[in-house]
Amino acid sequence: MTKKKTNTKAGSNTIALNKKARHEYFIEDEFEAGMELQGWEVKSLRQGKANIAESYVYIKDGEAFISGMTIIPLQQASTHVVANPTRIRKLLLSRRELDNLFGRINREGMTLTALSLYWSRSWVKIKIGVAKGKKLHDKREDLKEKEWQRQKDRVMKSALR
């Protein structure tokens, strides 16, 4: 029998993370979507030149789009094309997923936000979170819990020595 090929690539499959989203919102559910990209965008993503911190997802005419995502063009890759780093990109979701998201936005008042951008084999995928906004006191509670966890870890670490 032959051995299975192992992934020998060094590094992570993650291109960009939106850490701010988990601080600003309660994430109720997550979906994975493909993206419609141009050639220069794929080359830039291979170099990790993307930012999804200020991006949001909306549904228009039964299709999902992401706005506010920035992909910085490479100088050598996009010489013959006029590159728009902040263009609106179409997301590839199934009809059932689109209907589910559309219903949750309209009925429950939820928001769609981008959580992470990553490689799945040779395809770029984006993780979308169905989110509800946090109030200021919720953010404070999260910070208190995080600080309490750090203190517990410090005490346990010193007790084990």
From Swiss-Prot:
A GO term, aspect molecular function: RNA binding
Subcellular compartments: Cytoplasm
Keyword entries, A-Z: Cytoplasm, RNA-binding
Spans through the membrane: none
SUPFAM superfamilies: Small protein B (SmpB)
Entry GO terms, CC: cytosol
InterPro entries per the UniProt record, alphabetical: SmpB, SsrA-bd_prot, SsrA-bd_prot_CS
Origin superkingdom: Bacteria
Principal location listed in the UniProt entry: cytoplasm
Classification via Pfam families: SmpB (PF01668)
Biological process per Gene Ontology, one example term: trans-translation
PANTHER family to which the protein is assigned, alphabetical: SSRA-BINDING PROTEIN (PTHR30308:SF2), TMRNA-BINDING COMPONENT OF TRANS-TRANSLATION TAGGING COMPLEX (PTHR30308)
NCBIfam families hit by this protein: PRK05422.1, smpB
Family affiliation: Belongs to the SmpB family.
Role of this protein: Required for rescue of stalled ribosomes mediated by trans-translation. Binds to transfer-messenger RNA (tmRNA), required for stable association of tmRNA with ribosomes. tmRNA and SmpB together mimic tRNA shape, replacing the anticodon stem-loop with SmpB. tmRNA is encoded by the ssrA gene; the 2 termini fold to resemble tRNA(Ala) and it encodes a 'tag peptide', a short internal open reading frame. During trans-translation Ala-aminoacylated tmRNA acts like a tRNA, entering the A-site of stalled ribosomes, displacing the stalled mRNA.
Protein name, entry field: SsrA-binding protein
Organism encoding this protein: Vibrio cholerae serotype O1 (strain ATCC 39315 / El Tor Inaba N16961)
